């Protein structure tokens, strides 16, 4: 895709790089359009993409996955190089290609947070006069702003995720287990994802709702339990991430009031989202509000979403990113009452030219705490 290639070359100039060597699964998918499944499950099956200012990009892929690369990728078929994983070292093929491109004394950007020590040593031995630098920031910046095809995938997928969550709440009863809720969610997810996968199943009830990423167990749902459900998964390689909280039976006054405050924190944060706004400002306003209520602010209340579940920009106090049009954010304030329960509300939001647009949170009203039947 020309837009991706042009964007990479823009990053080459901005970060003063002569070449970019891409290896992480998410960035391989971004720069090639193909998802190679065994790149994740078999670590030795490297996929390596190389681009320079003057040379057309090439991609190196294990021979058994070459058909997938050819079928899914927008790369020129002539630029796809396959290797035998038992007789060839893909890093050496990449190094030879860099030499062919005249990169022996140039500045080469790589994802050093991903590159193994063995591969880094090989790069230094074979290209002793090249400058190998960390290009993680360049990749983060490339994926900050979503292209239209990315937005189409994210929005189409996420638009149905609320139905899955509220369908599970409607099917659940006191006396069932967390695993029963997960089964309802899994079945609903399979229907909308059409073959793609759910990751990190998060269902927690009662005191287990305090566990931010707790997997479902055989714990039985009891009247009065707070139940927190976070649905995360992929379709066409792009993530959805949406969370809701419910109570088994009628909420107490305390539960309803706590939820009302969480909704206000969530809505106030989203109301600030528009191009030019500082993520740190959004977080600091949230933290001030939570502190006034006597709640403990969590470390972040939002993150980017796309080919990975959590990506830049984060909404926290540690980084200050200026929001730009076509960023996709998840806004997710969380309130945990230690030893008792945890409340969370999460929605996906698109930054638009003049403000924002809710991607989730439009199908079912979230202003009232959702309920699960307590009559068994």
Annotate the PLM regions.
Residues 1-376:
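Active-site neighborhoods and metal-handling regions in enzymes and metal-associated proteins
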